[in-house]
Amino acid sequence: MRKKAISRILALVVPVLLSLNSQAFATSVQDESPVTGSAVEAVHTVPSTVAAPVAGHAEAAAGQAAKAEEKPGDLIMHHILDNSTFSFEPFGEVHLPHLEVAGFDISITKHVVMIWLAAILLVVIASAAGASVKKMSANQAPKGVANVFESLVDFISNDVAKPNIGHGYEKFLPYLLTVFFFILVCNLLGLIPYGATATGNINVTLTLSVFTFVITQFSAFKAQGVKGYLQHLTAGTHWALWIIMVPIEILGQFTKPFALTIRLFANMTAGHIIILSLFFISFILKSYIVAVAVSIPFAIFIYLLELFVAFLQAYVFTMLSALFIGLATAHSDSHDGHELEATARHGDGLTV
């Protein structure tokens, strides 16, 4: 009889206790976030030697939840924008040092690292190609990297610098070759996994354009003199129109480097956005069929197109730089000057 009475009491009490416990748990879940509530309970109910690891796991879980909730757009911008962190998912991250001198932030960023890497690669490749050419006999053709390097040098020299600058193009050739190979290597490094595109940073493209602008203006003063330079601003018009023509010509001098800056920056940035967007289509739609049939093939196609664009943009920037230098150093008589002017305007209309 006693056993039956005890079993009846337990049968009545246990469901009540379970219901009260479930209600209390539901109330705590509504009042607190899951991670914070569990972390607080762990700290208050377990010894201090166990509380710290539990709290650490709670923070790690919160960080993983935040990453999981990160939107594809945020991930794309994180890949494109410059920062001090190299992300090597799933292996971890490398944080670059923060440097500040006299209140100026001169921290090393991933684009700075890629610029250094591009410079080192250019020095190594050019040195190896030069050493290979020196070892060959006069009748022997270059091979491998030396052959590719020599072909590109001949192309910039004979098909870019010489026709656009004309007489005296040799003194501008070192700058044009440096700009071409630097932009090309930076563009290609941006296509490597875990890499970054330095030419997708408007500060980098602006600096390159400023170099071209300074060389162009200095060459114009040297070739034409102050008088000839000022006469070029008036463009042979009547003095009554100078108030209109001079501001337009001065503005035109600054629109050229601006066009160089935006063209290179926009093209290199747009290509990476398209590639990443195509990859994220499969994640957004949560479909393996879309990934296999649409997302991955189109991303590979755009990636191959970016290889072509890497060469094309290096060529366009170098060609327009040579064109602006040739326009600045052209003799004012002439048919050559007008022809270069027309070609420059046509070049400013390029959208590739």
Swiss-Prot record:
Q: What is the lineage of its organism?
A: Bacteria, Pseudomonadati, Chlorobiota, Chlorobiia, Chlorobiales
Membrane topology note? Multi-pass membrane protein
Organism expressing this protein natively: Chlorobaculum tepidum (strain ATCC 49652 / DSM 12025 / NBRC 103806 / TLS) (Chlorobium tepidum)
UniProt xrefs under Gene3D superfamilies: ATP synthase, F0 complex, subunit A
Name the domain of life.
Answer: Bacteria
Question: Subunit comment for this entry?
Answer: F-type ATPases have 2 components, CF(1) - the catalytic core - and CF(0) - the membrane proton channel. CF(1) has five subunits: alpha(3), beta(3), gamma(1), delta(1), epsilon(1). CF(0) has four main subunits: a, b, b' and c.
Q: Which UniProt keywords are present, listed alphabetically?
A: ATP synthesis, Cell inner membrane, Cell membrane, CF(0), Hydrogen ion transport, Ion transport, Membrane, Signal, Transmembrane, Transmembrane helix, Transport
Keyword Heme in annotation: no
Q: Which GO terms describe its molecular function?
A: proton-transporting ATP synthase activity, rotational mechanism
Name where it mostly resides.
membrane
Entry coiled-coil feature ranges:
none
Name the UniProt record assigns to this protein? ATP synthase subunit a 2
Family affiliation: Belongs to the ATPase A chain family.
Q: Which residues cross the membrane?
A: 112-132, 172-192, 195-215, 232-252, 264-284, 289-309, 310-330
Compartment list: Cell inner membrane
Q: Where is the signal peptide?
A: 1-26
Corresponding gene?
A: atpB2
Listed Pfam families: ATP-synt_A
Q: What PANTHER family does UniProt report for this protein, alphabetically?
A: ATP SYNTHASE SUBUNIT A
Q: Which GO terms describe its cellular component?
A: plasma membrane; proton-transporting ATP synthase complex
Q: What does this protein do?
A: Key component of the proton channel; it plays a direct role in the translocation of protons across the membrane.
